Regions:
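Trp/Phe/Arg-rich N-terminal binding region typifying the photolyase-homology
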Residues: 2-144
């Protein structure tokens, strides 16, 4: 009797976006801590590709190659709609959750809301910034 490869192994997807750090990345650590296998993905955002110049795209390509090398050539770099790409990976690997860094910019927050609205379970941890917006308070009145 054959058993599904998805039944005993807990898999999470870590969706890299602007923050390609491996060290000191709270969202990546959270994704790793509660799974047996991590699937790393970078979805090539068609809007960003269209709006970027050659130098920015070359830098992104170099950065993704370096990240892939650091991950032992296990980074999935896929162009397409975020929801479709993530759903295909979830189905292919039987992943339970998609982990991300909390996004604060309007475009990224709207993108993440669209992914969540599609029924994909998103776990938001940390921030793509060294210090999350709103965490540093002015001494005079304790406002951000």
């Amino acid at each position: 009797m054959s058993q599904s490869i998805h039944s005993t192994t807990k898999r999470n997807i870590f969706w890299f976006r602007r923050d390609l750090r491996l060290a000191d990345n709270p969202a990546l650590l959270a994704a790793i801590e509660n799974c047996d296998e991590l699937i790393a993905v970078y979805v090539l955002d068609e809007k960003i590709i269209k709006d970027s110049g050659a130098k920015r795209l070359a830098y992104l390509g170099q950065s993704l190659r370096a990240l892939d090398e650091s991950l032992g050539n296990k980074l999935h770099v896929i162009a397409g709609d975020h929801v479709e790409v993530l759903k295909k990976l979830i189905e292919k690997y039987g992943a339970d959750e998609v982990h991300i860094s909390q996004e604060y910019e309007p475009y990224g927050a709207a993108r993440d809301s669209k992914v969540e609205a599609s029924g994909i379970k998103i776990v938001k941890t940390g921030s793509p910034y060294a210090v999350a917006p709103g965490r540093v308070l002015k001494p005079s009145d304790q406002t951000p």
